[in-house]
Curated annotation (Swiss-Prot):
Belongs to the protein kinase superfamily. CMGC Ser/Thr protein kinase family. MAP kinase subfamily. SUPFAM superfamilies: Protein kinase-like (PK-like) (SSF56112). Disruption phenotype: No visible phenotype under normal growth condition, but mutant plants show reduced sensitivity to microtubule-disrupting drugs. Short roots with abnormal twisting (e.g. leftward skewing) in media containing microtubule-disrupting drugs (e.g. oryzalin). Dually phosphorylated on Thr-187 and Tyr-189, which activates the enzyme. Phosphorylated by MAPKKK20. ATP binds at I31, G32, K33, G34, S35, Y36, G37, V38, V39, K54. PROSITE patterns: MAPK, PROTEIN_KINASE_ATP, PROTEIN_KINASE_DOM. InterPro entries: Kinase-like_dom_sf, MAP_kinase, MAP_kinase_CS, Prot_kinase_dom, Protein_kinase_ATP_BS. One of its GO terms (cellular component) is cytoplasm. Interacts with PHS1. Binds to MAPKKK20. This is Mitogen-activated protein kinase 18. It comes from Arabidopsis thaliana (Mouse-ear cress). The gene is MPK18.
């Protein structure tokens, strides 16, 4: 299956270019595997921080799994809290209609509470208190949003070496809205039995409350105190036996509220059990901690405290101030309207795609305005990550560290370059004057940035060329998109609005004859709110300026201002241009560097022309 994924991804990767996120994340190692897919640790090269990238395979193979993923990504977007894991991004798929896998970028947590408990038998009372405090803070935030997690357990609480905990895995979570009863019932509850509240064992109650999460937190905290699960039941009956062995036989009024006939009969006929004192069960624990634990593990859900009430317990004196603990706004009913209707795979794909766009604001804006193309051919990083994930999956079982594949090219080379008309606003002409010449910065091997002989030998005045802006791509590679995007904007603009290309252009030497290599790339400067400046004609040398123009240039506050000239040859915006460096050098009094600057001005309102060199 992995080989098929590689073959399928090879063709798609040919269409991905550098201005996506393909180079943003550098894969380090596989840190987890499961039926859903793989989790890898990676470095975000933009910020330098470590992240976890979760690859979820075949999202839409089963509708129930797809709904669980949709529910989780939606809730994690809505529940932003320091004690809840954060989704940093979701990678944009290559196709809106046909994508099957998704890549979710999380903040990286080194371990989970299950591993912490298993590996540490020397946790202090301060550890116990801080762990419970963080879990209750997260639970308070969720419950104020009317969200029930329903699957709290140590493996679903991530941990760092600095004792920071974060709740994760909201796939089974549900939202209760104001127009529904305070107690709700969902038939698909399949949470881990060991941390399941007694009212859920055997479907005892037809309805249940957020107190089910409070019970789970109590079970987790007891495991933190002792280092082993509190109620490791092997079946529903065994689970009830373990619970009643510690808590004693429930009250008769509690048993009368049981809806399941068999369960009610089992509890009624159960021999009388007395509760075990918690100080005897947890002899080394803080007495204040045990008093709170006994409240969390009340058999009757009505006797359990809310998370806010638990945070106000004397156990957290000096640590918790309930008034400063954040609360969540209630979630809009429209966010989860999909839970009330029958959905097809295409419906869920559209909903998940909409969630992905929440992490790509410009594309979300286009989607909401209806200007997005139906086929969704935006650049994507999925191909790049698919290759790395597949490589790590195939080699993770071998001995020794797995070295991830490195990207061979910074961008995909092309054999031909096409120009595309991009209508732009008028730009001020920043071409050089006769007193200022443009000097190209030579590369290490003595060639210009385009890979041709350097023109830096031409003398320059004390006032140098306009300040360079770091280019968005290496010289000689494609740094602008040749694909038109809706109303004339580039696809690159939709991703990196702040990216500015290098303020110079490339030209070929006199020996080049291939017409495909005569195209140049003309970078645009930021627009200035001035009157439009007439363009130079490529057939008329810059020497056509008059003495009056020279005076105007000298008196203008902008040292790079080019005076207006008579319009001699209006170029059609649809014309594909190629600048002959030899002709410009012969006709221009500025030399090759000046000719290049004139070429920039000549292309100001014509469009973006891309240049490519083989890698």
């Amino acid at each position: 299956m992995q080989q098929n994924q590689v073959k399928k991804g090879t063709k798609e990767m040919e269409f991905f270019t550098e201005y996506g996120d393909a180079n943003r994340y550098r894969i380090l190692e596989v840190i987890g595997k499961g039926s859903y897919g793989v989790v890898c640790a990676a470095i975000d090269t933009h910020t330098g921080e470590k992240v976890a990238i979760k690859k979820i395979n075949d999202v839409f193979e089963h509708i129930s799994d797809a709904l669980r993923i949709l529910r989780e990504v939606k809730l994690l977007r809505l529940l932003r809290h320091p004690d809840i894991v954060e989704i940093k991004s979701i990678m944009l798929p290559p196709s809106k209609r046909e994508f099957k896998d998704i890549y979710v970028v999380f903040e990286l947590m080194e371990s989970d509470l299950h591993q912490v408990i298993k590996a540490n038998d020397d946790l202090t009372r301060e550890h116990h208190q801080f762990f419970l405090y963080q879990m209750l803070r997260a639970l308070k935030f969720m419950h104020t949003a009317n969200v029930y997690h329903r699957d709290l357990k140590p493996k679903n609480i991530l941990a760092n070496a600095n004792c920071k905990l974060k709740v994760c895995d909201f796939g089974l979570a549900r939202v209760a809205f104001n127009d529904t009863p305070t107690t709700v019932f969902w038939t698909d509850y399949v949470a881990t039995r060991w941390y399941r509240a007694p009212e859920l064992c055997g479907s005892f109650f037809s309805k249940y409350t957020p107190a089910i999460d409070v019970w789970s937190i109590g079970c987790i905290f007891a495991e933190v105190l002792t280092g082993k699960p509190l109620f490791p039941g092997k079946s529903v009956v065994h689970q009830l036996e373990l619970i009643t062995d510690l808590l004693g036989t429930p009250k008769s009024e509690t048993i009368s509220g049981v809806r399941n006939d068999k369960a009610r009969k089992y509890l009624t006929e159960m021999r009388k059990k007395n509760p075990v004192t918690f100080s005897q069960k947890f002899s080394k624990a803080d007495p204040l901690a045990l008093r709170l634990l006994q409240r969390l593990l009340a058999f009757d859900p009505k006797d359990r405290p809310t998370p806010a009430e638990a945070l106000a317990d004397p156990y957290f004196k000096g640590l918790s101030k309930i008034e400063r603990e954040p609360s969540s706004q209630q979630i809009s009913k429209m966010e989860f309207e999909f839970e009330r209707r029958r959905l097809t795979k295409d419906d869920i794909r559209e909903l998940i795609y909409r969630e992905i766009l929440e992490y790509h604001p410009q594309l979300l804006k286009d989607y909401m305005s209806g200007s997005e193309g139906s086929n969704f051919v935006y650049p994507s990083a999925i191909g790049h990550l698919r290759q790395q994930f597949t490589y790590l999956e195939e080699n993770s079982s071998r001995n020794g560290p797995v070295i991830p594949l490195e990207r061979k090219h910074a961008s995909l080379p092309r054999s031909t370059v096409h120009s595309t008309v991009v209508h732009s606003t008028s730009q001020p002409n920043l071409g050089a004057t006769d007193s200022r010449r443009v000097s190209f910065e030579p590369s290490k091997n003595g060639a210009s940035s385009a890979g041709h002989p350097s023109t830096s030998a031409y003398p320059t005045k004390s006032i140098g060329p306009p300040p360079r802006v770091p280019p968005s791509g290496r010289p000689g590679r494609v740094v602008e998109s040749s694909v038109s995007y809706e109303n004339g904007r580039n696809l690159k603009e939709a991703y990196f609005r702040s990216a500015v290309s290098s303020p110079h252009c490339y030209f070929r030497p006199n020996t080049m004859t291939n017409p495909e290599n005569r195209n140049i790339e003309a970078s645009s400067f930021p627009p200035k709110p001035q009157n439009p400046v007439h363009q130079f004609s490529p057939t008329e040398p810059p020497a056509a300026t008059t003495n009056q123009a020279d005076v105007e240039t000298m008196n203008h506050p902008n040292p790079y201002f080019q005076p207006q000239l008579p319009k001699t040859d209006q170029l059609n915006n649809n014309t594909h241009m190629a600048i002959d460096a030899k002709l410009l050098q012969a006709q221009s009094q500025f030399g090759p560097a000046g000719a290049a600057a004139v070429a920039v001005a000549a292309h100001r309102n014509i469009g973006t022309i891309s240049y490519s060199a083989a890698s």
